Amino acid sequence: MTKYEIFDYDVWGNEEDGYSVNDVIPTGIIIYTDTSKSSICKKLGLDDPYKIDVYVNEDVIYIDYDYKPYCELRKID
């Protein structure tokens, strides 16, 4: 498992017009997870791994929940 900090999103928009991330806020919350949807869902306290979309690059995991930007996990070395 890899160590990440959770960064919260300030999201603007709506389902009809689409969403955009207005600001990214560090939470100071550290979690350990792998990149599987079920693990990320459990660590973030979300109820349905089928509503989650995960986009992974080398240092950041971007998470959408129910088609809306939710948060990102930034890798800590």
Question: Where does each model-flagged region fall?
Answer:
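Compositionally biased, low-structure terminal segments
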Residues: 5-8, 33, 56, 68
